[in-house]
């Protein structure tokens, strides 16, 4: 079960950049297999706000995650992801605006849906070190 959780969590980070480049009406379809509310709605709002000011995402965070617990349909993940090849990009120039850090601590919760699929429901960037 932990393997399924980690697989979904890992793919979640790879679909954010394609979702940021997609039309607003396609974003939910790209993200929904890997994210659920409240994180899904938060992501959609954030991507729309970024697009409104000419920003998108580039790259993908590389998880170094472990599942810390699975209780019923809820799983907790602790991550020290490498975000050094990801960040915000100017949609006009194609140039990076921000660059992530190589050791980014993240706590996430995944929920298993009625279809049996695990989806990220919350993401917390702790601001600590890892």
How would you name each of these model-derived features?
Residues 1-56:
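Core segments of small alpha/beta cavity-forming domains
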Residues 26-39, 63-66, 74-78, 119-121:
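Short low-complexity stretches enriched in small and charged residues
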Residues 39, 83-85, 127:
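Solvent-exposed loop/turn segments at secondary-structure junctions
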Residues 40, 60-62, 70, 103-108:
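Short, surface-exposed, polar/charged, turn-prone segments marking secondary-structure boundaries
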Residues 52-93:
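Surface-exposed, charged secondary-structure patches
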Residues 76, 96-130:
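Short beta-strand edge/turn micro-motifs at domain boundaries
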């Amino acid at each position: 079960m932990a393997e399924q959780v980690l697989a979904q969590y890992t793919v979640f980070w790879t679909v954010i950049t394609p979702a940021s480049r997609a039309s607003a009406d396609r974003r939910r379809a790209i993200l929904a297999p890997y994210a659920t509310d409240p994180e899904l709605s938060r992501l959609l709002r954030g991507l729309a706000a970024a697009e409104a000011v000419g920003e998108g995402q580039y790259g993908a965070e590389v998880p170094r995650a472990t599942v810390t617990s699975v209780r019923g349909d809820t799983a907790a993940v602790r991550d020290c992801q490498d975000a050094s090849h990801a960040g915000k990009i100017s949609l006009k120039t194609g140039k990076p605006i921000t660059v992530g850090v190589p050791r980014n601590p993240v706590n996430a919760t995944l929920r298993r849906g009625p279809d049996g699929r695990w989806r990220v429901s919350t993401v917390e960037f702790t601001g600590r070190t890892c």
